[in-house]
């Protein structure tokens, strides 16, 4: 499914939208000097219109994004259009010709005239529109003088061409993540330097890539966070952000890059986080400020960059060898979420001399200890405050995983939001979901899109998870089936684009159904065994872009007896709104403990292999237990639990239900 865009004609109602209230978007109409009746009418909430309309009308001053099919289905409803037309008619009848919106005591024609007479505000198209509108309104007294163009004898530095220290030729089986891992470079560097797109969709066999500098790597998993990564790497959050410029200053977008390899140590970066200048490249004088420079950028600048279509702040910083933090400092008018870059305008991308000498530059001061009578040691600390999602009422606050429901407009949303399905893919039971989320109802248990729920407490227990539903998706339109799929397929699943394609392969998928890639290709002849993964995800750009594929022509494979062994792997997603098979991690589940387990007289139940002989305290594994839950319950550390139970793996995927583990010596 290809990305879809909204035609400009879709904004024909923009004037109406801006004069009323969409849920979640508010405007102080009472401050505009309008009549009481007009204000009351304008203050009407149109509940039938989606918040997507407010976002696309730019009511939140954010970025207008490209929409995909589910967004369009939510946006383009007959009820919304009818209600907007009705409100427009009511506004026209309630608000008189004296109800003129005068913001900040400036009449609109007058402010427009002043703008057109300024060399900084004049534009031929705006001038034509102004003349046309004042003429149609029979407004007089607004004749303007075309200003003399304001010019400098300089132009902005053209977009730089990346200098490649190394190159790489793409193979048929490559992904952005595999290239990054093999060459010891960050995934984002590979993606941004070569304009491959967030989902790596522009990666083509035979293409020559420019590789970024090497560094020590770590792959982001769904269980990571910035604090844990910097602790493990013995570094700091400012350094981590400096080495990985796609991370925002608060590091709150860390989990947007699950599956990416990031730098946790980089020799070519200074400890403070700024890009270390290559010898001889430190600028000592500023270049002339270009005529198209952003007004709020530093004028004491050694290099300017003109924003091109598709650019983002992180892309610009990587291409110009500057950290994202420094880019924001040199261009203070840019929002920290980079939603207000102006196309065709120039931004400063290189300081003059040492950027730390600029007034107002935030300098990181090392931790300091000093003594004064009486002796007192003070140590500076670094605090990271991350935004928190809205949790369901009463939901446990110590869970290891949270999730929310899919949008109602999605195919099979009711099934995929059901507690039985959520429990199944997370390796827990419905009873546990109800226990961890008291707001959920046993009779109609389903996750809401607006709230986050606890879906896992520690690691899942190694036991089969009952699920009486089906993995088969309900296809609404046969046109969604890829041509060439076998005609007798009676069970479909689907995959999504975006980050999902970075860590999902055909091998991951078939491992769930106990057959090989060859059989998957037989079910879907439009795939080939040699390029199965690439063909499965072809043209899937974003996380809301998905494709159906056949997983069985003999019924739901979930309810068929496994042919090869008792062990089955259920792949899970970090958030429920991703496609069913989009796998950053997996939970291994077994039907029973191995028959070789032994029992002793002391423990209250059979023990797992590897328990120490001097154990004095035991815990019998119950449904819902995981390593985190066990060592937290007994006030011990994870290291102690693994030391006393040497055969338990670090990911706790092999503890056995009903067996005793040592929790004290």
Swiss-Prot record:
Species of the source: Pochonia chlamydosporia (strain 123)
Name of a matching Pfam family: LysM
InterPro entries hit by this protein: LysM1-like, LysM_dom, LysM_dom_sf
GO MF entries: chitin binding
Claim: Signal is one of the keywords in the record: yes
Protein family (similarity comment): Belongs to the secreted LysM effector family.
UniProt cross-references to SUPFAM superfamilies, sorted A to Z: LysM domain
The name this protein goes by in its record: Secreted LysM effector Lys3
Domain topic, free-text comment: The LysM (lysin motif) domains are small globular domains involved in binding chitin in eukaryotes. Lys3 contains 5 LysM domains.
Signal in keyword set: yes
Induction data: Expressed constitutively with no significant difference during colonization of banana roots.
UniProt biased composition (Low complexity): 592-602
Region (Disordered): 585-610
Glycosylated residues (UniProt): 43, 153, 234, 398, 531, 614
Record domain LysM: where: 166-211, 216-264, 303-349, 409-454, 617-663
Matching PROSITE patterns: LYSM
Gene name in the database record: Lys3
Protein keywords: Chitin-binding, Glycoprotein, Repeat, Signal, Virulence
Secretion signal span: 1-19
Note: In plants, chitin acts as a microbe-associated molecular pattern (MAMP) that is recognized by lysin motif (LysM)-containing plant cell surface-localized pattern recognition receptors (PRRs) that activate a plethora of downstream immune responses.
Function: Might have a role in sequestration of chitin oligosaccharides (breakdown products of fungal cell walls that are released during invasion and act as triggers of host immunity) to dampen host defense.
């Amino acid at each position: 499914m290809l990305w879809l865009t909204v035609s400009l004609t879709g904004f024909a109602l923009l004037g109406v939208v801006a004069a009323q209230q969409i849920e979640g978007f508010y405007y102080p109409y009472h401050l505009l000097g309008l009549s009481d009746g007009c204000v009351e009418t304008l203050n009407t909430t149109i509940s039938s219109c989606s918040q997507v309309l407010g976002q696309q009308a730019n009511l939140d001053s954010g970025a207008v994004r490209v929409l995909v099919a589910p967004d369009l289905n939510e946006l383009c409803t007959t009820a919304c259009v009818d209600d907007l037309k009705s409100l427009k008619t009511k506004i026209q009848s309630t608000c008189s010709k004296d109800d003129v919106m005068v913001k900040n005591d400036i009449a609109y024609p007058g402010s427009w005239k002043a703008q057109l007479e300024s060399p900084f505000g004049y534009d031929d198209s705006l001038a034509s529109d102004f003349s046309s509108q004042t003429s149609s309104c029979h407004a007089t007294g607004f004749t303007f003088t075309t200003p003399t163009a304001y010019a400098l004898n300089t132009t902005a530095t053209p977009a730089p061409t990346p200098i490649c220290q190394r190159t790489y030729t793409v193979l048929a089986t490559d992904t952005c993540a595999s290239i990054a891992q093999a060459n010891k470079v960050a995934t984002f560097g590979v993606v941004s330097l070569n304009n491959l797109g967030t989902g790596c969709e522009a990666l083509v066999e035979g293409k020559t890539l420019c590789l970024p500098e090497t560094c020590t790597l770590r792959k982001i998993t769904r269980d990571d966070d910035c604090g844990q990564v910097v602790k493990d790497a013995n570094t700091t959050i400012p350094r981590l952000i400096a080495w990985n410029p796609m991370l925002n200053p608060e590091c709150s977008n860390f989990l947007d890059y699950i599956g990416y390899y990031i730098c946790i140590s980089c020799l070519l970066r200074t400890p403070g986080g700024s890009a270390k200048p290559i010898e001889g490249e430190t600028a000592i004088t500023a270049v002339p400020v270009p005529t198209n420079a952003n007004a709020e950028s530093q004028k004491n600048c050694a290099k300017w960059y003109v924003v091109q279509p598709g650019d983002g702040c992180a892309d610009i910083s990587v291409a110009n060898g500057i950290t994202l933090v420094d880019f924001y400092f040199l261009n203070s008018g840019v929002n920290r979420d980079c939603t207000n870059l102006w196309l065709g305008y120039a931004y400063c991308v290189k300081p003059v001399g040492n950027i730390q000498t600029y007034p107002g530059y935030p300098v990181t001061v090392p931790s300091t200890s000093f003594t004064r009578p009486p002796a007192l040691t003070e140590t500076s600390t670094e605090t990271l405050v991350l935004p928190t999602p809205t949790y369901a009422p009463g939901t446990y606050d110590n869970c290891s995983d949270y999730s929310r429901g899919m949008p109602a407009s999605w195919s099979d949303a009711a099934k995929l939001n059901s507690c039985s399905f959520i429990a199944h893919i997370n390796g827990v039971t419905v009873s546990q979901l109800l226990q961890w989320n008291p707001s959920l109802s046993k009779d109609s248990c389903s996750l809401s899109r607006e709230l986050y729920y606890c879906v896992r407490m520690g690691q899942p227990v190694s036991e089969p998870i009952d699920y009486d539903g089906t993995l088969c998706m309900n296809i609404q339109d046969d046109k969604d089936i890829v041509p060439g799929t076998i005609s007798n397929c009676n069970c479909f699943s689907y995959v999504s684009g975006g980050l999902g394609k970075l860590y999902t392969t055909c091998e991951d998928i078939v491992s769930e159904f106990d057959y090989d890639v060859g059989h998957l290709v037989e079910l879907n002849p439009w795939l080939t065994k040699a390029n199965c993964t690439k063909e499965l995800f072809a043209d899937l750009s974003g996380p809301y872009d998905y494709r159906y594929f056949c997983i069985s022509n003999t019924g739901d494979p979930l309810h068929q007896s496994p042919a090869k062994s008792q062990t089955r792997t259920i792949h899970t997603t970090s958030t429920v709104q991703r496609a069913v098979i989009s796998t950053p991690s997996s939970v291994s589940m077994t039907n029973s403990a191995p028959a070789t387990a032994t029992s002793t007289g002391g423990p209250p139940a059979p023990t797992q292999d590897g328990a120490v002989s001097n154990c004095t305290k035991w815990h019998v594994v119950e449904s819902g237990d995981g390593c985190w839950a066990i060592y937290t319950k007994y006030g011990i550390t994870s290291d102690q639990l693994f030391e006393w139970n040497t055969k338990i793996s670090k990911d706790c995927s092999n503890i056995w239900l009903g067996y005793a583990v040592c929790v004290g010596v």
